[in-house]
């Protein structure tokens, strides 16, 4: 059966997008897991290691492990466990496959919306190949972002169908896909607002006899009301997410610092989109840095200026103001006003928002097409090819940094300088792989650089725990005492001190630290290097010390 020309072109474009993704991302088949979240999500997660069972499906819908509620993401990991066992390449190739599907759905959504092959292909290729999206694909733990995008674009397609047909079935599918996206990652709470924007973009490319402003005024109810009913779901899932993430929320950051960081982060995201170099795993939030205050005014002026430009061009190029609103709005859940963790911003957060910024490129290409020159089609094709090839080359390099936990953490530290989180992740990897000389050299150098006493204590306690397991009890005792002197006082540090002194035969010191360990607070952090079986260790030490101090009867 011969396909229609439009269908043939659509298939060709989707195949081109898929192939373009495969070229830089095929290397992940040889990559390994990292010790930054992959351990908690995958290879050290007891439920995932059991595989797909009814009990684990129930667990997926009730757990808030990893400070998130995303049951569909957990189920996808369980399925991968059944398919690939513990082979990292399988999980990562599935990420690539999901990313291919998301990019093709993005192409179909924008093709449906704009009827412009140029617009759809340009935006989809930017989404598919932009190096800032590598983190979402080459990091097994970020499956949630890709799944969310797949159902996000499916919701856009069904909603566009609803715009055209007013079909209850199409609207019902939109609701279902929206719920599935929320089950994957709660960042999609902004989808209802995005549906309003996609409705406006649809009007731009499907004009009638009315001017666009007049049409928007007359049909505002048809734009707002269908999306508003979905906002109820957004509100509910926002509450669920806030509850799940409460354990990871950073309440020590003042609201003023969070607002400042949010403004500066918008500026940084713009820079990451248009000049994606020096990308890192973790960008530390340094609220005490006085330079942040100096950067606030330029960031605010930039956002204001770009907003004014977009509004001034709204009559001639409404795509620009729609794209700008897409970017600003979809960033809100992750911009840092509610601070979760210690990062100032993250590559992975730009996965959906960058689509709004991508609108500028098809607009530029359309302007090239309006030039009265005979080679304008060749000029557009050449420009699009240059854009795609440059992104592909940058992505190829960025993917290579993710070959293992050591590679990505070292690269991240090279970009940002000393940063606590990658150092801890690297410590876990070095310990798990027996690279102790590198571990101790790294910890000694970074303990000297760390300004935060609590973080210094964590690094010193990590070192002490590894030394203790190696049988180097004196060095372990020295290291954990440094941690205690820096204020890192909790059950873990006191127990480690007690165990080390017991092995050294210093019973009085062991008794002293054991008594403190029994009443000290629990350590509220997930770290495999600080998560030894405390209760069993303390009970064992209690019995050993009791044997030592109980006098033997005279015979």
Which positions does each model-derived feature cover?
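C-terminal luminal/periplasmic domains and tails of membrane-associated envelope-modifying transferases
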Residues: 2-3, 406-555
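Polytopic membrane enzymes that build or remodel cell-surface glycoconjugates and lipids
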Residues: 1-437, 450-458, 469, 503
């Amino acid at each position: 059966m011969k396909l229609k020309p439009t269908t043939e072109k659509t298939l060709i474009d989707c195949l081109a997008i898929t192939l373009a993704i495969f070229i830089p991302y095929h290397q992940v088949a040889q990559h390994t897991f990292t010790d930054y979240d992959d351990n908690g999500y995958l290879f050290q997660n007891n439920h995932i290691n059991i595989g797909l069972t009814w009990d684990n499906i129930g667990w997926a819908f009730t757990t808030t492990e990893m400070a998130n509620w995303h049951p569909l993401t957990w189920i996808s990991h369980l399925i991968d466990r059944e398919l690939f066992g513990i082979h990292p390449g399988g999980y990562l190739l599935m990420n690539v496959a999901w990313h291919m599907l998301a990019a093709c759905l993005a192409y179909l959504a924008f093709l449906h919306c704009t009827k412009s092959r140029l617009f759809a292909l340009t935006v989809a290729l930017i989404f598919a190949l932009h190096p800032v999206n590598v983190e979402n694909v080459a990091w097994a733990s970020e499956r949630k972002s890709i799944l969310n995008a797949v159902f996000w674009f499916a919701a856009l397609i069904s909603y566009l169908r609803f715009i055209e047909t007013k079909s209850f079935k199409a609207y019902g599918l939109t609701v279902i896909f929206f719920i599935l996206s929320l089950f994957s990652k709660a960042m999609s709470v902004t989808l209802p607002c995005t549906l309003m924007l996609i409705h406006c973009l649809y009007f731009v490319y499907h004009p009638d006899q009315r001017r666009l402003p007049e049409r928007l005024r007359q049909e505002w109810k048809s734009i707002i009301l269908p999306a508003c009913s979905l906002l109820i779901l957004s509100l509910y899932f926002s509450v669920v997410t806030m509850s799940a993430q409460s354990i990871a929320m950073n309440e020590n950051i003042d609201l003023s610092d969070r607002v400042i960081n949010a403004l500066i982060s918008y500026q940084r995201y713009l820079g990451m989109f248009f000049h994606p170099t020096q990308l890192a795993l973790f960008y530390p939030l340094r609220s005490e840095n006085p330079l942040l205050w100096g950067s606030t005014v330029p960031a605010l002026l930039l956002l204001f200026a770009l907003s004014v430009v977009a509004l001034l061009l709204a009559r001639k190029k409404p795509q620009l103001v729609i794209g700008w609103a897409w970017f600003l709005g979809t960033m809100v859940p992750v911009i840092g006003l509610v601070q979760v963790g210690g990062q100032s911003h993250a590559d992975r957060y730009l996965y959906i928002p960058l689509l709004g910024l991508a609108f500028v490129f098809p607009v530029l290409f359309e302007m090239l097409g309006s030039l009265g020159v005979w080679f304008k089609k060749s000029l557009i094709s050449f420009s699009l090819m240059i854009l795609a090839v440059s992104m592909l080359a940058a992505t190829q390099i960025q993917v290579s940094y993710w070959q293992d936990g050591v590679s990505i953490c070292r690269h991240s530290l090279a970009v940002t300088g000393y940063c606590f989180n990658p150092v801890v992740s690297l410590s876990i990897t070095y310990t798990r792989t027996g690279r102790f000389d590198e571990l101790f050299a790294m910890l000694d150098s970074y303990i000297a650089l760390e300004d935060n006493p609590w973080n210094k204590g964590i690094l010193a306690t990590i070192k002490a725990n590894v030394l203790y397991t190696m049988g180097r009890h004196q060095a372990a005792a020295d290291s954990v005492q440094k941690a205690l002197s820096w204020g890192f006082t909790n059950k873990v540090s006191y127990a480690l001190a007690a165990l080390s002194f017991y092995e050294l035969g210093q019973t009085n010191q062991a008794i002293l630290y054991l008594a403190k360990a029994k009443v000290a607070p629990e350590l509220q952090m997930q770290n495999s290097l600080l998560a030894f079986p405390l209760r069993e260790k303390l009970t064992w030490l209690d019995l050993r010390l009791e044997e030592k101090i109980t006098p033997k009867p005279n015979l």
